[in-house]
Regions:
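Non-catalytic signal-transmission and effector/linker regions of two-component phosphorelay proteins
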Residues: 1-20, 26, 33, 51, ...
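Short acidic/polar segment at the start of the alpha1 helix of CheY-like receiver
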Residues: 25-29, 72
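Acidic catalytic/metal-coordinating carboxylates
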Residues: 48, 75-80
């Protein structure tokens, strides 16, 4: 049997970047996830930092993490950032908090993760995610 294959020279498109959204307030998490999906991102959701660690340990592909700072569980957002620096040093994280100055100070001390102050608009979030992602893919 002689089958003819139609092979294209066009590059295979890359999958959209995957954002792990870590937020304990389900309504906030749902809105963020929906906006990011509409903006062309794949999204994985976690209700707290402990759940985020389990997602990452399961081997689910994640390109960047967007996490609230104040959450219940054994880790908060800063603890998650420290865990990522230790266990997944190439994985970017952006933190968000309503207490911006205190969060920035703590971030500088423990994880050096950028902080997006609440309230933020979705366009700013998308821009920051894309900027951090392009930083990792630039030569």
């Amino acid at each position: 049997m002689n089958a003819s294959l139609n092979v294209s020279n066009e590059p295979v498109p890359a999958p959209p970047p995957t954002v792990l959204v870590v937020e304990d307030e389900i309504l906030v998490r749902t809105v963020i996830a929906a906006y990011l999906r509409d903006g062309g991102f794949d999204v994985v959701e976690a209700g707290n930092a402990d759940e985020a660690v389990r997602v990452l340990a399961a081997g689910i592909r994640v390109d960047i993490v967007f996490s609230d700072v104040n959450m219940p569980g054994s880790l908060d957002g800063f603890g998650l950032a420290q865990w990522l620096r230790r266990e997944r040093p190439g994985l970017e994280i952006i933190l968000t908090s309503g207490a911006a100055q205190g969060a920035r100070d703590a971030s500088d001390l423990c994880a050096h993760a950028p902080i997006l102050a609440k309230p933020y608009d979705h366009a700013t979030l998308a821009r920051q995610l894309r900027a951090r992602l392009s930083k990792n893919t630039s030569p």
